[in-house]
Amino acid sequence: RLRPGAAGRRDLAALAAFALVGVTLFYASLALAIDAGGISLAFVLLYTAPAFVALLAWPLLGERLDRRKLLLVAVAIAGVALVAQAGGGMRVGPAALAWGLASGASYASYYLFGKWVLHHYAPVTVFAIVLPIGAAGLAPLVRFAPSKPPEAWLWLVVLSVVSTYLAYLAYYTGLRRTEASRAVLVATVEPVAAALWAAAWFGERLGPLGWAGAA
C-alpha cells in the first residue's frame, strides 16, 4: 500500500542512504568528473547508467534482460558519446574515468532504488526527505559566496524547484509506470535536449556526428 505520509525509522535509514548515494555522491562525482576530464567525457560516463540499470535490474527487480534491451543500451550509450564528442575537450585519465563511472553508478541508483521506494511512498514524500539530506552531505564541498545579486538567488531558486525538485517528481511519476531499464533508456534524451537548448540559447552547434548521435 502506498504511504504518502511520514517514513518509518527503517525506511528513513534507507532513504538517508539513498540520499547520500543518489544526491551527495552523484552530484559530487559528476562535478569532479567534469573537472578531471571535461564535460564531454563526464557525460559519456554518466550515461553508462543504462548499462548498470539493465544488468542490476535483472537480479534485483526481476526485470528480463534480453538481447534487444542490451542492444538498446549500447545504441543509447553510443549516441550519447557522439553528442558529447561533438563538444570536444575530452581529457581521459584515471581520475576522470573513476569519477565518471561513479556518477553513472550513483545515477543508476535512482532507478533501482526508486522501483522499491515507489511501492511504499509517494514521490513528494521521497524527495522531501532525500533532497535536504543529500544537499547537507554536499555542504562541506561547497564554497559559499554570500554576496550574490538578487537575480543570482532567483536563478538558484528556479534551478532548485524547477530543474531539480519538479524534474525528479516528474520522472519518478513516470518510473512508477514502467520498467527501470526502460525508463533509464528514455532518460538518455537528456543530453540531446541539452544540446538543443545550447543551440537555441547560446548559439552552440552540433556537427554531423552530434546529430547522428542525437538521432
Where are these predicted regions, by residue range?
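Transmembrane alpha-helical segments that form core, pore/gating elements
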Residues: 1, 53-55, 59, 73, ...
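Specific transmembrane alpha-helical segments of multi-pass solute transporters/efflux pumps
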Residues: 2-40, 46, 75, 82, ...
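Juxtamembrane helix-entry segments on the extracytoplasmic side of multipass membrane proteins
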Residues: 7-13, 70, 85-106, 143-158, ...
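Hydrophobic transmembrane alpha-helices of multi-pass small-molecule transport proteins
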Residues: 16, 56, 65-86, 131-138, ...
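Hydrophobic/small/kink-forming positions within alpha-helical transmembrane segments
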Residues: 19-24, 28, 50-55, 81, ...
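Helix-helix packing/entry segments at the starts of transmembrane helices
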Residues: 23, 41-48, 113-135, 164-200
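Hydrophobic alpha-helical transmembrane segments in multi-pass integral membrane proteins
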Residues: 25-35, 81-90, 134-148, 192-210
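Hydrophobic/aromatic residues within transmembrane alpha-helices
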Residues: 33, 45, 59-65, 117, ...
